[in-house]
Amino acid sequence: MVSLKDSHFDLFHLPAQFALDDAALDDAYRTVQTQVHPDRFAAAGDAQKRIAMQWATRANEAYRTLRDPLQRASYLLSLRGVDIGAENNTAMEPAFLMQQMEWREGIEDAAAARNVDALDALLAELRDEKRVRIERLGTLLDSGADQAAAEAVRQLMFIERVASEVGAQIERLET
């Protein structure tokens, strides 16, 4: 029997690894939700309803975490005792720092020129960069290179923030 304290992977009876079969995760989630959904316990006592709600909440949280590659990577690293240090570890490779500056300048220039096409192109570039880096992250995690994976997670978090800023700029310019 799985407990509320077991890992997300254990909850869904999946291997604790980065590479996951999305269909297997979806199926496992539906199975767990079917078993613990609060509607199944409508006629039960308050204690059982509360427990069902806890399990349903836990299943939703676990599913959201495992469904998102970046969250899954962060979670895997936390299970391995690796703190990604996103709040206080901002040290990054010089090449990535240069890339950050280029992206920021691209955002500023395109926003100042009200150039939505340039922002769209930058957003596409960021999405491609994220895809490539997530593939690399999977290789790092599944090979046990946890410190390099933590660095990759921090970089991906930055890429997501920049992509969000680009999206906000596009929205602002289109309204």
From Swiss-Prot:
Domain of life from the UniProt record: Bacteria
Keywords: Chaperone
A GO cellular-component term linked to this record: iron-sulfur cluster transfer complex
Signal sequence region: none
GO MF term list: ATPase activator activity; protein-folding chaperone binding
GO BP terms: [2Fe-2S] cluster assembly; protein complex oligomerization; protein folding
Quaternary structure and partners: Interacts with HscA and stimulates its ATPase activity.
Protein's job: Co-chaperone involved in the maturation of iron-sulfur cluster-containing proteins. Seems to help targeting proteins to be folded toward HscA.
Record family assignment: Belongs to the HscB family.
NCBIfam families the record matches: hscB, PRK03578.1
Official protein name in the record: Co-chaperone protein HscB homolog
Encoding gene, per UniProt annotation: hscB
